[in-house]
Amino acid sequence: MAENKPFRGPIRANTDRKANRRGAARLAAVQALYQMDIAGAGINDVLAEFESHWLGNEVEGEQYLPAEAAFFRDIVSGVVRDQTKIDPVLDTALERGWPLQRIEAILRAVLRAGAYELERRKDVPAKVVVSEYVDIAHAFVERDETGMVNAVLEQLARQYRGDEMGPK
């Protein structure tokens, strides 16, 4: 697997469309889940930190795109609440010999958030969920890992929303 890249970066865009706010919320959720995994930070502290210091604010000279705060909270809280259900599903979807705990922390965060959204957020098209989390992964890992993210999330999309995904 690739070396972990530094995990900071502005959430920027020229427009404040709902899709951009949701994309920013997804990226912030992955960052928050990563922080919780690596630093052992608690959910309340992480939610408060991101909502007061990161989302829509200027940090170290970079303007972060406003994120849909309720969507951000739903993803982070949902992953934490459902993690004991999400992790075994991801372990099954991953290749044999690569359990979830063996992959990079950033990929765990991406996969957990994507799995949660695929299972629980039926208001978001499955293909959008897969595409968004593959794009997020691409910002931090090499192409091989983004391919793995795509394969795992597509497998889960077919499992949770087969009718929506259509034939293989």
UniProtKB/Swiss-Prot annotation:
GO biological process: DNA-templated transcription termination; transcription antitermination
SS bonds (residue pairs): none
Gene Ontology cellular component annotations, sorted alphabetically: cytosol
GO molecular function: RNA binding
SUPFAM superfamilies, per the entry: NusB-like
This protein's UniProt keywords: RNA-binding, Transcription, Transcription antitermination, Transcription regulation
Similarity field: Belongs to the NusB family.
HAMAP family on file: NusB (MF_00073)
Role summary: Involved in transcription antitermination. Required for transcription of ribosomal RNA (rRNA) genes. Binds specifically to the boxA antiterminator sequence of the ribosomal RNA (rrn) operons.
PANTHER family from the UniProt entry: ANTITERMINATION NUSB DOMAIN-CONTAINING PROTEIN (PTHR11078:SF3), N UTILIZATION SUBSTANCE PROTEIN B-RELATED (PTHR11078)
Protein name as annotated: Transcription antitermination protein NusB
Gene: nusB
